[in-house]
């Protein structure tokens, strides 16, 4: 499980909470508190889906894009399908980013 993420230079803590603690949603993002909450007990795939979904919310808020929930959902599903259909893609992107001079 991931406990910390950096989104556009801002560090977020990631908390995993029970269904009792997070009853109405699978995840939530609190930009001002630098916090992402994920409901525990999901399958690994669903947990990854929720984490990516909340990261897109964090990007949306940082860029002030004002995405709708549907746009965030569709972007999440699209990226997950892209990664599933192209399993070498994440490794390739990561290797290119690691070698890039900033």
Where are these regions (language model features)?
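Active-site recognition of the HExxH zinc-binding catalytic motif
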Residues: 49-61
